[in-house]
């Protein structure tokens, strides 16, 4: 009997339709970097609230310097000194200037700032009581940052859904926000299945292997914006698996297992989901990662990945990562895809869509993007995944690609929404 394999796009749609953004939490603005705002951020005051100097120098009336030149310099009286955080309480009149520091408010009457380096100090230290000479005119607004140059009070400085950059945290602080609301990091329960598995710090006996998938999946979960919770290794025992899965479902927003997703005698996980929840699919037309179960347990999304490291990695990238990003409120949930030129031939005999580990680089001479497959696509090898920066996507159907053919690559080294 032929296996029922669903297309990857259908599987992705099913997964995304069964997850929703998490509840809102309020966090410090600096912790919001990298995540989308849940609500519009509105400035409570003008940013900047006053016109200020863009550099150290002298605040002047440009009208006083209209005739200034090297042959006929203009001398002004220094009537005060103003640093950032200090306000000169007077006003500048004809023939007067104020020594000013970067960021300080431009005094009343002044409409320009002349940088310190091109002003000649005739006597004193250049501060109040000194006389200074100018040898060139100053333009209105020269070296002056206007009030409300960034935003007016009441303006939206960052829209809901916009991802906060590190500089954006500063913008939010300028707008009066010490904290902002974002969608909470979903808790993702991770369970490794298999009697043959031992913890990474243990020396495996004959027939045993170290559990590498849990470390990789926790790192991938954290990178996607979620909080990984590891529930340990479950042996090939229905009761042990059920106990861990039940606990994870109760405590987490999303549950992921690796191992126990194929048709082996000891693969109990799909049977558990069928018995206690709902299986929405259990095979995908994809390599690696054909044997993937997705369903609902206790109303929570459940994803059963293959125990093969490469299959688990690709399954996470294609299904779990987009789901986690949706739960965090991101509008962009898919990795960027770009075209590159193959450096070698690739032959595919199977119908399934392939995602081969590869590296894409730009030719330094021509600027052309070139993609080279890893030498081996063995699904048990982790080094090729560590060193790959893309997945070479080869769509359904047998094919034979030649060096020089243009192909699609999924950039796993770039964040979603990257413009290429």
What are these regions (language model features)?
Residues 1-69, 99, 330-355:
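Short, low-complexity N-terminal leaders and the immediately following helix N-cap/first helix
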Residues 25-30, 39, 85, 106, ...:
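Flexible glycine/proline-rich
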Residues 51-53, 66-71, 89-93, 106-108, ...:
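Solvent-exposed alpha-helices and their adjacent loops that cap or buttress functional pockets
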Residues 1-8, 178-305, 309-315:
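Helix-rich terminal scaffold detector
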Residues 13-24, 38, 42, 124, ...:
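Generic secondary-structure signature for well-ordered alpha-helical cores
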Residues 4, 8-12, 25, 29, ...:
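Generic structural signal for well-ordered, non-membrane alpha-helical segments
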Residues 15, 57, 154, 190, ...:
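Residue-level signal for inorganic ion chemistry
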Residues 2-3, 8-9, 59-235, 370, ...:
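Short, glycine/charged-enriched hinge/interface segments at domain edges or termini
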């Amino acid at each position: 009997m032929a296996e029922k394999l669903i297309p990857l796009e259908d599987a992705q749609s099913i997964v995304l339709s069964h997850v929703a953004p998490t509840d809102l939490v309020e966090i410090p603005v600096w912790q919001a970097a990298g995540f989308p705002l849940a609500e519009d951020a509105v400035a409570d005051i003008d940013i900047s609230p006053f016109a200020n100097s863009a550099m150290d120098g002298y605040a002047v009336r440009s009208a006083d310097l209209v005739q200034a030149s090297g042959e006929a310099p203009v001398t002004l009286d220094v009537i005060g000194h103003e640093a950032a955080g200090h306000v000169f309480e007077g006003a500048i009149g004809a023939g007067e200037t104020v020594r000013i520091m970067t960021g300080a408010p431009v005094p009343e009457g002044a409409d320009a700032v002349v940088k310190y380096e091109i002003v000649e100090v005739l006597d004193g230290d250049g501060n109040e009581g000194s006389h200074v000479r100018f040898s060139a005119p100053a333009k209105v607004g020269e070296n002056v940052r206007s009030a409300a140059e960034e935003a007016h009070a009441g303006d939206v400085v960052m829209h809901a859904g916009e991802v906060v950059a590190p500089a954006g945290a500063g913008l939010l602080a300028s707008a009066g926000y010490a904290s902002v609301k974002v969608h909470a990091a979903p808790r993702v329960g991770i369970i490794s299945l298999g009697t043959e598995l031992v913890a990474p710090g243990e020396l495996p006996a004959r027939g045993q292997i170290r559990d590498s998938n849990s470390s990789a999946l926790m790192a991938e979960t954290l990178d996607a914006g979620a909080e990984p919770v590891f529930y340990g290794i479950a042996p090939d025992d229905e009761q042990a698996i059920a106990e861990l899965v039940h606990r994870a479902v109760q405590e987490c927003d999303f549950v992921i297992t690796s191992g126990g997703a194929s048709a082996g005698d000891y693969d109990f996980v799909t049977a558990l989901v069928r018995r206690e929840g709902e299986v929405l699919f259990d095979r995908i037309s994809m390599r690696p990662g054909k044997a993937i179960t997705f369903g609902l347990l206790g109303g929570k999304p459940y994803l059963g990945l293959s125990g093969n490291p490469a299959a688990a990695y690709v399954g996470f990238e294609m299904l779990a990562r987009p789901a986690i990003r949706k739960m965090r409120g991101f509008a962009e949930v898919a990795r960027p895809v770009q075209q590159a030129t193959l450096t070698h031939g690739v032959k595919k005999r199977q119908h399934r869509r392939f995602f081969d580990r590869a590296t894409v680089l730009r030719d330094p001479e021509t600027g052309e993007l070139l993609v080279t497959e890893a030498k081996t696509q063995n699904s048990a090898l982790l080094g090729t995944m560590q060193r790959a920066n893309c997945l070479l996507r080869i769509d359904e159907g047998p094919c034979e690609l030649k060096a020089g053919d243009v192909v699609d690559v999924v950039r796993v080294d770039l964040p979603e929404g990257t413009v290429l």
